[in-house]
């Protein structure tokens, strides 16, 4: 029996999640939910449905885990608690200062719905945070280094694009 997965949001992250699911034989992508017209969205998994985000509730008994692939600025603070009432959810919320608030909102909604909500499962916070934790346990007097620096920030670019009147934007760290 495979874990039935839904993806909510099919931008760069959603497409990457689909590719990861395809590499795991114990997982099955059953549906992708989008705000766009589903007929305009082409996915790699031929057996999965592409649906409007408004139809997600109709799938609550057909999906074991909904992976939320929206942005941390405006999508996930609303979407994760909303969908945690209906599904076990995973998100990549990365606004560090707001993680306690986001956790409290998701936890309350998930408990109310009898589900599990796992937040901030990304690079940082997420995998990089765990790696730093493990390294600090082994080398308590060590020093942390990160590679944040020059380049395009997807999260910041997403936040700028959501400002009323902005047609498109990219945020560069120089």
Predicted regions mapped to residue ranges:
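Short acidic-hydrophobic, aromatic-tinged amphipathic segments that line or gate anion-handling sites
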Residues: 49-56
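General beta-strand structural signal in soluble alpha/beta enzymes
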Residues: 91-92, 117-121, 147, 170-171
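NAD(P)-binding Rossmann-fold cofactor-contacting core
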Residues: 23-44
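Rossmann-fold NAD(P)-binding glycine/threonine-rich loop
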Residues: 93-117
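Gly/Ser/Thr-rich loops at beta-strand to alpha-helix junctions
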Residues: 11-13, 96-99, 120-129, 151-153
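Active-site-lining helix/loop region of Rossmann-like oxidoreductase modules
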Residues: 3-8, 12-17, 134-174
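Rossmann-fold NAD(P) dinucleotide-binding segment
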Residues: 56-61, 65, 73-92
